[in-house]
Each structure stands twice: as structure tokens, then as C-alpha cells.
């Protein structure tokens, strides 16, 4: 497994990051540990989680994923880069979510307890909270770093102008700088390229995108004429409707069919093609890959092993999916 510099920091991370949001609902603990073992065996030493996971759960299940990851990490914490996130609703009170100093400082403590560690490598804001001044959030993240409870900080699902403002405010106030972003990015959703990508390249920000396989649609296993398969992202608890709204449309399926043909010509699976396309973008640090079974990691591991796509194949994919750069951000 190759490694890549994490933005402008001195940290290096594996070219694939294992996403864990299926752990605790879509996957039971035994399945989750099998996936973690397979990822480890494949050379992945970068893990991403969040306090609100598992995906599709509710407040009753929030935190289960971190607990599963923490139990598996026992005795091998130093072998991994661990990233987690806060901002989501973790309790019944209005202050149990968001970017307030109170919530961030309490959330990091709770995450560390669940993960069974005294620090995380990357602590990220899982979304943007318009009710909290950005300086308050940055000062809280700075405190987390200075207390030794996180090494770096990042954001997920932030628009480019908010990242730019945070960079400016952190420089002005001498607080911890945003070192990574976690956007949604794949062949069917390329809005990241319009403004956030050039900002990241110019400012030296690591990019760890999620959904490189569009929730599984880019594996080619789904058929539009049928109902979504049970046990997939498209039927998973409260998240099923969100994933169907994102990707379950005629236009997406038409594009997938065209991509399937290119994959056949290139003699690789559609999933491997899709992940190699993401890895071919030089701005990308490590796409976050997920699985509900260990064997599902094989296509992504093959993508990393084979490396960037040949220039002619990438050019065909870029041209075919160029219109997906203009998809509304709320999709």
C-alpha cells in the first residue's frame, strides 16, 4: 500500500482510508472486525469514523461504531491513523450538537472514551453549524490540539467559501488550521472540482473524499427497474431515503451503463475503474472506502495497487461525466 502526504503537514497516510459507518447497524461486530482485519491485511492503516455513526441509526445507536473500532484497536492503536468527527446530534439537548465550544470539547472526550484512546490523529467537524461563530469553533479545535487530544483538524461537507473563511480566521487568530476536507466525490458527483478542489490545491489541504462508489451504485450491482436491495445503503434505516435521493435516478443509471462498457474494455471491474478514477486526481489524498463484507474491499485494493488510470481512459471518463460537475450540492 502506497502512502501520501496529508496536505501540507508532515503526516503520511495510506492511499485508501477505511470508512466505518456501516459498523453497528448494517454490519454486526463480528462482520465489522472481519472488514477491519481485511483492510489491515491489505495495507490500509488509515481509519475514518464519527460519533454519530452507524449510518442509518438514531440517537440510541450513535457511538456504537466508535466503540466497535475502539475494541478492535486495542493493543494496536499505534499502527493506525484514526480520524473521527463531531457536530451531529448526540443527545436530547440543543447543545448536544453543533460547533459550539461546549459541544466540541465534550464530544472529543466522549469519542476518545469510546475509541479507547487518549488522542485521535484527525478531528473533523462533520458539517457546518450556522448558529456558531466560526472563531468559536476554531478556538475550540485549537484547544483540542493544544491539550494533545488531536494532532490535526479538518472539516467534512463544508462549502469552499466557508473553508476559505476558516483558513483566513485561523491565520488571523493563530488558531489550529484546517488541514483536511472530506467532500462527497465520485464519477456521478463532481461538484467538488468547481471551487473546493482548486482551493485545496492552492492551500495544501488534504482531501479524503467519501462515497467514491456512489453508495454502491458504481459497483454495477443495482438495477433501476428493480427495488433497492435490502441490506444496502439504499435501504439502510433512516439513510436509505437519503441515498435514493442522491443516486437512484434514471440519469445516474444511464451513466453507470456507459461506464460499465468502458470498464469492460479496460478489463477491470466497474468498482475498480471508479476508485482508480478518484485516485487519478492528484488533489486526492485518500478516498474513503466502505464495505459491508470483507470481500467488497478487493476492488478498491486492486484500484490502489494498479494506480492511476491510463490517460486515455481517464479522459473518456472525464468527458462522459463532465455534466456531473454541475449537480446541485443538495443532491
Where are these regions (language model features)?
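Short, acidic/polar
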Residues: 28-39, 99-115, 163-167
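Structural motif corresponding to the early beta-alpha repeats
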Residues: 52-53, 75-99
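Active-site groove signature of glycoside hydrolases
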Residues: 112-131
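Beta/alpha (TIM)-barrel catalytic core signal, keyed to glycine-rich beta->alpha loops juxtaposed to Asp/Glu
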Residues: 132-320
Amino acid at each position: 500500500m502506497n502512502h501520501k502526504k496529508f496536505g501540507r503537514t508532515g503526516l503520511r497516510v495510506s492511499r485508501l482510508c477505511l470508512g466505518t459507518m456501516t459498523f453497528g447497524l448494517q454490519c454486526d461486530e463480528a462482520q465489522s472486525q472481519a472488514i477491519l482485519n481485511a483492510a489491515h491485511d491489505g495495507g490500509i492503516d488509515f481509519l475514518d469514523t464519527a460519533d454519530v455513526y452507524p449510518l442509518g441509526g438514531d440517537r440510541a445507536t450513535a457511538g456504537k461504531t466508535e466503540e466497535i473500532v475502539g475494541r478492535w484497536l486495542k493493543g494496536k492503536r499505534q499502527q493506525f491513523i484514526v480520524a473521527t468527527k463531531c457536530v451531529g446530534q448526540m443527545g436530547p439537548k440543543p447543545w448536544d450538537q453543533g460547533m459550539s465550544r461546549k459541544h466540541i470539547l465534550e464530544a472529543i472526550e466522549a469519542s476518545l472514551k469510546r475509541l479507547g484512546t487518549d488522542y485521535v490523529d484527525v478531528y473533523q467537524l462533520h458539517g457546518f453549524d450556522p448558529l456558531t461563530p466560526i472563531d468559536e469553533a476554531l478556538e475550540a479545535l485549537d484547544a483540542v490540539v493544544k491539550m494533545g487530544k488531536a494532532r490535526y483538524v479538518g472539516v467534512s461537507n463544508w462549502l469552499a467559501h466557508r473553508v476559505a473563511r476558516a483558513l483566513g480566521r485561523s491565520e488571523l487568530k493563530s488558531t489550529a488550521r484546517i488541514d483536511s476536507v472530506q467532500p462527497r466525490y465520485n464519477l456521478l458527483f463532481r461538484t467538488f472540482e468547481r471551487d473546493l478542489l482548486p482551493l485545496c490545491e492552492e492551500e495544501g489541504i488534504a482531501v479524503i473524499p467519501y462515497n467514491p462508489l456512489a453508495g454502491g451504485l458504481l459497483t454495477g450491482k443495482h438495477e433501476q427497474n428493480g427495488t433497492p436491495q435490502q441490506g444496502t445503503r439504499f435501504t439502510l434505516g433512516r439513510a436509505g431515503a437519503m441515498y435514493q435521493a442522491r443516486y437512484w435516478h434514471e440519469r445516474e443509471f444511464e451513466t453507470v451503463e456507459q461506464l460499465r462498457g468502458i470498464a469492460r474494455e479496460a478489463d477491470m471491474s466497474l468498482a475498480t475503474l471508479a476508485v482508480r478514477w478518484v485516485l487519478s486526481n492528484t488533489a486526492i489524498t485518500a478516498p474513503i472506502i466502505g464495505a459491508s463484507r470483507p470481500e467488497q474491499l478487493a476492488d478498491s485494493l486492486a484500484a490502489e495497487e494498479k494506480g492511476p488510470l491510463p490517460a486515455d481512459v481517464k479522459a473518456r471518463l472525464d468527458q462522459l461525466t463532465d455534466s456531473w460537475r454541475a449537480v446541485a450540492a443538495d443532491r
